[in-house]
A protein has these predicted regions:
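Short, low-complexity disordered leader/linker segments with a strong preference
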Residues: 1-45, 68, 376, 434-442
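Extracytoplasmic "Venus flytrap"/periplasmic binding protein-like
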Residues: 65-137, 146, 171-174, 280-282, ...
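A structural signal for short loop-to-beta-strand junctions that line the ligand-binding cleft
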Residues: 90-91, 98-99, 130-169, 208, ...
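Hinge/lid segment of periplasmic solute-binding proteins
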Residues: 105-162, 204-211, 308-310, 374-379, ...
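C-terminal lobe and pocket-closing loops
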Residues: 125, 296-304, 316-410, 441
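Extracytoplasmic/periplasmic solute-binding protein
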Residues: 147-156, 161, 185-245
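Conserved C-terminal helix/tail region of periplasmic/extracytoplasmic solute-binding proteins
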Residues: 171, 264, 386-442
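Glycine-centered hinge/linker elements that transmit conformational signals in sensory
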Residues: 190-191, 241-273, 303, 312
Length: 442
């Protein structure tokens, strides 16, 4: 009896040990599985952009592809163009900002100076990804993201301003298409011949009726910016050393006069007509024959007539210059996942370079590559690529918005909307602009 009891107790003990071992093994396996899941769990990277509905949809397709290829991150976009600058500035000042965000060249200088953008200088130097090679970027596109010898972001587009023309209207009036010899004089001559009144007379005819124009040769409303014409004439609006605004130089004054004369000429619609009918809409509706717009505007793909894309006419002495409109992306200095955010930043920047016209990298500025990426714009790409070689950007600095506010409201608005004489305004406005620059230098 005693032996049977001992045997029973031994069996119970053995079963208990086996059950305990299984439970421990299950617990260990479960723990290992959880640890593996945590190791492979992606980091959520929040991205803020100003993209509208259509652009956000295209962007999402890019993000879906990147997210599927990455084991590290999952980029989630928050795209809303409404009050973007105000919203992102507020978010970055607090603790609710995104990990990545789109930023204009103008804002980049401000954000970098306020330490809200992550300094990525060393990270770029240590990366072997082609997109991180800063020597491949056009200097005009990279310079807005530099502050005190450090880099705080990368551009994902530099779209030069180009000349869109309605070839059908050129053909109808017998005007030759633009070529490399086009300067201000040839541009004006074409604009006159392309400006038609209700009687079919053009602006170069003595009997032309400027009060009853039905077709205009050109249009402007503050765009294209006057800086383009100042540069083409050998002038500038901010000196290279940021010490002053040389808008009173002979070269600059002549360019302001050229711009004002265009605004007041019959070749350009009145500002009221432009407001009523729509700026680029008038070009699309064949009421304007020539339009200066960004390369990414893609007007050549959005109209029902033969549309050509050309380089801008050069200045009187042959100087070629255009504006390179630069947009880019930065990393929030307060991101909790800087390493992963940087990798997502690089991958997304590279992907946008494949998407947008024109990528700001010299290695991508060749016609064969661009035709593969954008076959629908094959005829426009050479002029765009050529324009990149001499595209310039504004000289941004920390207080640039203050400078630009005075330049716009005190100088350009009166010229455009009130027919003011630039020679009268310039002596009054220059001291105000110089004061902003001197304040920034302190």
């Amino acid at each position: 009896m005693k032996k049977r009891l001992e045997l029973l107790l031994s069996l119970i003990l053995l079963i208990s040990i086996m059950i305990s071992g299984c439970a421990t093994q299950d617990k260990t396996s479960s723990s290992q599985k959880n640890e593996a899941d945590e190791a492979t769990q992606k980091v959520t990277i929040r991205l803020s952009t100003w993209a509208g509905a259509d652009e956000a949809k295209e962007l999402q397709a890019i993000l879906d592809k990147l997210n599927s290829q990455s084991n590290e991150y999952e980029i989630v976009q928050d795209s809303n163009p409404a009050d973007y600058d105000t919203r992102i500035t507020t978010q970055l000042a607090g603790s609710s900002g995104p990990d990545l965000f789109w930023v204009s060249a103008q804002r980049a200088a401000q954000f970098a100076s306020k330490n809200v953008m992550l300094d990525i200088t060393q990270r770029l130097a240590q990366s072997n990804k082609p997109v991180a090679n800063i020597s491949d970027y056009y200097e005009t596109s990279l310079s807005p993201f530099k502050y005190k010898d450090s880099i705080y972001g990368l551009p994902w587009i530099e779209q030069p301003v180009v000349l869109y023309i309605n070839k059908d209207l050129f053909d109808k009036t017998g005007v030759s298409y633009p070529d490399s010899s086009w300067n201000w004089d040839k541009f004006l001559d074409a604009a006159k011949k392309l400006t038609i009144d209700k009687n079919g007379k053009n602006a170069s005819d003595a009997s032309f009726d400027k009060e009853n124009v039905t077709q205009w040769g050109f249009t402007l409303n503050g765009w294209p910016p006057v800086q383009i014409f100042v540069w083409q004439n050998g002038g500038d609006v901010i000196s290279e050393d940021f010490s002053n605004s040389p808008i009173d130089s002979p070269e600059a004054e002549a360019a302001f006069k050229f711009y004002a004369d265009l605004v007041n000429s019959p070749m350009v619609p009145s500002q009221q007509i432009i407001k009523d009918r729509g700026f680029d809409t008038m070009f699309k509706n064949q009421q304007v024959a020539m339009f200066m717009g960004g390369a990414a505007d893609s007007l050549d793909t959005k109209v029902d007539f033969k549309c050509g894309v050309y380089e801008l006419p050069c200045g009187p002495t042959g100087i070629k210059a255009t504006l390179g409109d630069v947009l880019g992306m930065g990393i929030n200095a307060k991101t909790k996942n800087a390493d992963v955010a940087f990798e997502a930043f690089l991958d997304l920047t590279d992907a946008i370079h494949q998407w947008k016209v024109m990528p700001p990298r010299k290695s991508m500025a060749n016609i064969d590559m661009m035709k593969k990426l954008h076959p629908d714009r094959a005829d426009a790409l050479q002029a765009i690529i050529n324009s990149m070689e001499y595209a310039r950007t504004y000289r941004y600095f920390e207080n640039y918005p203050d400078w630009d506010n005075i330049f716009s409201t005190q100088l350009m608005d009166p010229i455009i909307n009130s027919h003011a004489d630039p020679s009268v305004l310039i002596p009054k406005v220059k001291p105000q602009l110089d004061a902003i620059l001197k304040k920034a230098a302190k």
